[in-house]
């Protein structure tokens, strides 16, 4: 069971920040209840018709948003100085609390979920059980999910391509979300059941996620040319808000959740590659030079011994990690190993994104060919892809874990390319996707982080999740059903809350306001942390 751990300054800071938010939110709900009750009494008056006419006139100037908040309130919040908003919050001003009730609710719910993380992973209130792998059960559950998803959520899409204006749908958003979803399910089940025999497949799945980072970010920046501070901040918020609070609450290192720093790094590299001299991105030779430069950076960083350690050692405080089970390893070992496995695949994603319009035009021409020629070309593509996939499986995938990892950085593009070719080989395959997996694909970041603490258990700071969370002892399948339902629900809520709070604190067209918000957030965090240090010095 979980051992008692000393409370940290970060945890005290979180409590100091979240308790006032909870109080303000509860009070705002009380104020809203009073206002609604008064409103109901007024409308129960005998002069209902007259009052209704007056109300209709008043409502002409008010447009309600989600949560029952008028649009003018949101404008007032953004137009008010941060200092003014903070004073109104601390003094529990009625109008301010009612105006921002939805935001306070989102912040309070976010805090409550993090508290549940701590309860589940670091206390003895909930139990734990050992992992147990059974191949038959593992395959049964996954195949059952595929069958149910195919029967209930298979959907045809008719989206038009922004490049050709036709429904080619090559590597469309529905397809990539579905791809992320079915991979994520296997990735999570691999952890839950300790399915060590599919380790090499999991490595390919993680490479595919990184490939999508290169593909998706390149597509966005290349097409929309939006290198604004707001867009950059939104990306960093999406990737790191949840994980940052998880590290604070559970006293974990950032590298425990290695997917987050990996995606952050490769997102930054794509942003830098396209953002530098962005006005020349339309010139093919310039783009070729940029991609070649990316390869050069990776080669120098990861292939030349000693360079990685020299470059990253100043960031050891952020990227260092010590596994309690392997304390003898260097602090940067985990970062070197994890980032090195997928050091090239993000560039492959960029290349595929760059040639995406060209391939789409080829596919459009292919669909316009006569039936015999079209069939022969598609059959050839499927046959070649299948043969290449078979060779990779026989000579690379079947290698032992340690040997496979040596080949992985140079070969992970092969199964990814094979899957893309097969998945997009016909118009019918491109038209359809399973929306259940696509839905799961949208919350991969949340499910990845949450699994450590409310699906599995680690019990100690920086510990790997070696146990299962147990709410129903002696009934492993019932327990699996319950904790999975809670886990997926919480992950989805975290996805929604992250986006809700992003819209509140990250202005999209006001860099000055954004900078003020960042500075205010840093100042508040510093004050809370300083206060927590003082409180922890008080003798118990």
Swiss-Prot record:
Q: Which GO terms describe its cellular component?
A: Golgi apparatus; Golgi membrane
Keywords, sorted A to Z: Glycoprotein, Golgi apparatus, Membrane, Oxidoreductase, Phosphoprotein, Transferase, Transmembrane, Transmembrane helix
Query: Where in or outside the cell?
Result: Golgi apparatus membrane
Null mutant phenotype reads: No visible phenotype on cell wall acetylation in single mutant. Severe growth phenotypes (e.g. dwarf and abnormal flower organs) associated with reduction in the secondary wall thickening and the stem mechanical strength in the quadruple mutant rwa1 rwa2 rwa3 rwa4 and characterized by reduced xylan acetylation and altered ratio of non-methylated to methylated glucuronic acid side chains. Absence of interfascicular fibers and xylem cells differentiation. The triple mutants rwa1 rwa2 rwa3, rwa1 rwa3 rwa4 and rwa2 rwa3 rwa4 are also dwarfs with abnormal morphology.
**One GO process term, biological-process aspect:** xylan biosynthetic process
Which Enzyme Commission number(s) are on file for it?
2.3.1.-
Gene Ontology MF term list: oxidoreductase activity; transferase activity
Annotated glycan sites: 424, 431
Expressed, tissue-wise, as follows: Expressed in cells undergoing secondary wall thickeningin a SND1-dependent manner, such as xylem cells and interfascicular fibers. Mostly expressed in the middle and bottom parts of the inflorescence stems. Mainly observed in the more mature parts of inflorescence stems, but present ubiquitously.
Q: How does it sit in the membrane?
A: Multi-pass membrane protein
Q: Which InterPro entries match?
A: Cas1_AcylTrans_dom
Membrane-spanning segments: 7-27, 137-157, 182-202, 203-223, 235-252, 257-277, 291-311, 340-359, 377-397, 436-456, 470-490, 518-538
Which residues are recorded as modified (Phosphoserine)?
A: 44
The family note in this entry says:
Belongs to the PC-esterase family. CASD1 subfamily.
What this chain does, per the entry, is described as: Probable O-acetyltransferase involved in the acetylation of xylan during secondary wall biosynthesis.
Tell me the protein's name.
Protein REDUCED WALL ACETYLATION 3
């Amino acid at each position: 069971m979980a051992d008692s751990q000393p409370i940290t300054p970060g945890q005290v800071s979180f409590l100091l920040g979240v308790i006032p938010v909870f109080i303000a939110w509860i009070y705002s709900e009380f104020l809203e209840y009073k206002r609604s009750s008064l409103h109901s009494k007024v409308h129960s008056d005998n002069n209902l018709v007259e009052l209704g006419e007056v109300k209709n006139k008043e409502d002409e100037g008010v447009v309600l948003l989600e949560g029952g908040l008028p649009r003018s309130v949101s404008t007032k919040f953004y137009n008010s100085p941060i200092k003014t908003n903070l004073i109104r919050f601390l003094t529990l001003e009625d109008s301010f609390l009612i105006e921002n009730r939805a935001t306070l609710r989102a912040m309070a719910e976010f805090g409550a979920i993090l508290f549940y993380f701590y309860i589940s992973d670091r206390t003895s209130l909930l139990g734990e059980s050992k992992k147990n792998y059974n191949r038959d059960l593992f395959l049964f559950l996954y195949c059952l999910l595929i069958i149910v998803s195919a029967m209930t959520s298979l959907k045809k899409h008719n989206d038009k391509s922004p490049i050709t204006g036709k429904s080619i749908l090559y590597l469309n958003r529905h397809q990539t979300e579905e791809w992320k979803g079915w991979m994520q399910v296997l990735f999570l089940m691999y952890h839950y059941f300790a399915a060590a025999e599919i380790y090499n497949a999991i490595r390919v799945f993680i490479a595919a996620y990184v490939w999508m980072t290169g593909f998706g970010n390149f597509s966005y920046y290349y097409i929309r040319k939006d290198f604004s501070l707001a867009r950059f901040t939104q990306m960093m918020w999406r990737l790191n808000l949840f994980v940052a609070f998880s590290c604070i609450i559970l006293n974990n290192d950032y590298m425990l959740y290695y997917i987050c720093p990996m995606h952050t790094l490769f997102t930054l590299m794509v942003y830098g590659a396209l953002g530098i001299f962005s006005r020349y991105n339309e010139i093919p030779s310039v783009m070729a030079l940029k991609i070649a430069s990316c390869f050069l950076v990776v080669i120098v960083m990861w292939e030349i011994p000693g360079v990685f350690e020299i470059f990253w050692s100043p960031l050891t405080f952020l990227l260092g990690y010590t596994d309690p089970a392997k304390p003898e390893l260097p602090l940067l070992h985990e970062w070197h190993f994890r980032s090195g496995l997928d050091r090239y695949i993000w560039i492959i994603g960029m290349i595929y994104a760059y040639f995406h319009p060209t391939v789409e035009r080829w596919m459009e021409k292919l669909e316009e060919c006569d039936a015999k020629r079209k069939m022969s070309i598609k059959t050839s593509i499927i046959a070649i892809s299948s043969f290449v996939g078979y060779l990779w499986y026989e000579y690379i995938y079947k290698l032992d874990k340690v040997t496979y990892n040596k080949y992985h950085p140079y070969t992970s593009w092969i199964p990814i390319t094979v899957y893309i070719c097969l998945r997009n080989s016909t118009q019918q395959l491109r038209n359809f996707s399973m929306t259940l997996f696509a839905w799961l694909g949208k919350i991969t970041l949340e499910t990845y982080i949450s699994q450590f603490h409310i699906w599995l258990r680690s019990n100690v700071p920086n510990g790997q999740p070696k146990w299962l969370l147990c709410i129903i002892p002696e009934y492993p399948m019932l327990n699996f059903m319950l904790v999975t339902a809670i886990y997926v629900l919480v992950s989805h809520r975290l996805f929604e809350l992250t986006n809700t709070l992003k819209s509140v604190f990250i202005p999209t067209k006001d860099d000055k306001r954004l900078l003020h918000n960042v500075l205010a957030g840093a100042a508040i965090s510093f004050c809370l942390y300083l206060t927590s240090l003082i409180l922890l010095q008080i003798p118990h």
